[in-house]
């Protein structure tokens, strides 16, 4: 990554750099957690990750703390997306009662009645039409209920919305929360000043979504492992017949360009040497393991084979910094999860600093049972991808610098 961008974000002031005593604090958290149809939360990681900043403000005697978050993509007010569904879990994890405010006006009333150190959760901020438009009126309203604005929602830091950007124009003090700081420090450790050799593991289904990342990262890394359906397009660029495998035909020449550029910059790219293939993803009665160039007619590659697994594990072992973005096979189907899981075990066995991009990658690491053995797992999917692409995230641009 171009050092300037990440260094600029690394110099953001955090809540530890200011005094919150007797001040009204508004924290933009990310409580956008997955739930089942009965509104039971299946993974509360995002709530847990927000606790250190909330507790820091309580311990340092903030007058009151307003928590602001979105949940899903509601179109207007919709009970299905109410943050009431997460209130009990937040109370349990925080170990205290939390007042619930249906509206911003309601927050003001609660602030006047509340005792010092009380916590208020505002209803889903996306119920306000102006939120995603970064509307000035909503931004000023939010700023009016706080003396200090803290952004701790890394997962939405690539979005220029009222609660992540607009509010900062009107709030008296604007700083990063402890999670936001931890995220940017981890990315800086992996990209701005990494221990070498640096390895990028990149997967997922689309080359198109990882193009900017690949071009940007060639200046940072020493080697790249490309897996998942993405690797099919690169294997085709090397002249292999990929049969029925998912290939982005319009990007084969782009893949060739990346391979050439990597060679020019002396970055070694590793692709699968053998693959697991099937003629039917749903039924998968017929499964074959063949060299990558010998996929049987009518079959599609769905995972890396054992020789690739061994090769990739050796590459991992010889790395000091590992950045991983995107799973390397259809890990949700047990029969095709071995490649991704084996690699997760290999990464956990190293002493390297491992930075895991959010979203599907974090989910795959979870399913492999290796969450606790990674150095840092990002809470943001889209946000972490944009950082790897070398972008400055909008939410960081509006916060105060040291």
From Swiss-Prot:
Single biological process term from Gene Ontology: gluconeogenesis
Binding site for ATP: 210, 332, 358-361
Annotated disulfide bonds: none
Gene name for this UniProt entry: pgk
Subunit (UniProt): Monomer.
EC class name: transferase
Name listed for the protein in its UniProt record: Phosphoglycerate kinase
Segments crossing the lipid bilayer: none
Catalytic activity line of the entry: (2R)-3-phosphoglycerate + ATP = (2R)-3-phospho-glyceroyl phosphate + ADP
Residues holding substrate: 30-32, 46, 70-73, 126, 159
Organism of derivation: Helicobacter hepaticus (strain ATCC 51449 / 3B1)
